[in-house]
Amino acid sequence: MKTSFTEPDDDSLFSKFPLSPAVKVIIVIPVKNEEDYILNSLSVFSCQTDVLGNPLDLEHFEILILANNCTDNSVLHIKDFQKKHPDLHIRLEVTTLQKSQANIGYVRKVLMEAAYHRLMRNGGGIIMTTDGDTVVAPDWIAQTQKEIEAGADAVGGRILLCQKEIQFVDQWTLHLHTKDETYHLLIAELESLILKTPHDTSPRHHQHFNGSFAVTTDCYGRSGGIPDVAYLEDCAFFERLEHIDAKVRHSHKVRVHTSARTIGRTEVGLSYQLNVWKNLGTERRSLMVESAASIVSKLVRKRNLIELWNVRKCQDFNIFETFKKITNEIPTDDMLYHSFLESPFFGEWYSKFKKLEEIILMKKFPRTCLDQALVDLKKEVVIYSAPSFSQTSIR
């Protein structure tokens, strides 16, 4: 049965399906022509475990699947899987979207909204999302719940390439992918060392993407949900979470493996990035990235601004003078300073400051080749890891 809808919050979507009062987790999966992957993706949900390896109660979660514009056997495979696993609460909607809506941003938003409203009927819970070409770990749900119970508002899981498919990726593409991963992991390590964010300590990673992401209904509601974008909705949503100072945990214990295909289902995504790296190899061009010096400069300044923001209501020292000292390289004005004092969220204010900062940093620190950046980042990690290293106080 096909469902037609025009608004992301259309209450008719999935409304015909019963909701067990025990459900506290809803997983959403968008599907478009995933006949080669969807069965592997779904199979692991029938054998989810807790963190000790004991079977997870299937009554505690359900899976919402929106199959849109499929021209292959994806829907048949899903329905067949449903019949073979009647105890697994899989809710399937099938639709053909018009061109303006036939994009991953719209579909993911529709799914997340549906999950949010269903969970709110049960008093709230956790919305989780993955993809139709991705296989989650057996303890994926449990490890996510553990991170949220520890205080996180949202959890980004570690997304790895499917080992069986890596052998089919050309060596240059895999080479660049590995180096790019190392680059971002080193940045994540520096963020941990410099910012010392209590809810996202080392070991941590850099991914907060659709292959493995979770958010509490409370945080989802406060953030305003996923913005109206055609793609990269995960990045847009993460920005919204940053704006409300959400506690986002990048956990290595939450793991998935995703397809290494280079022909994807969205305009921009991992498959798109793999193709970019492949073309760089064909053209023998170097991958240019932000330099270690720029990254450290940005992180140290952000740390100092966070410290100042936390004491901005104090009267025992000159806030304005300290603010100007921290931001001396950045052209700030009185309006930006006053918004710093009054903003309810640091992240909301910092998003405005960051735009000004990026202009200056691009001029001061030219982009560098990836190999050099890796060398420099490793040096910075050693420096900031030293027990004797003393961070400069804003006071």
Language-model regions, residue ranges each:
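Conserved nucleotide-sugar donor-binding
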Residues: 208-224
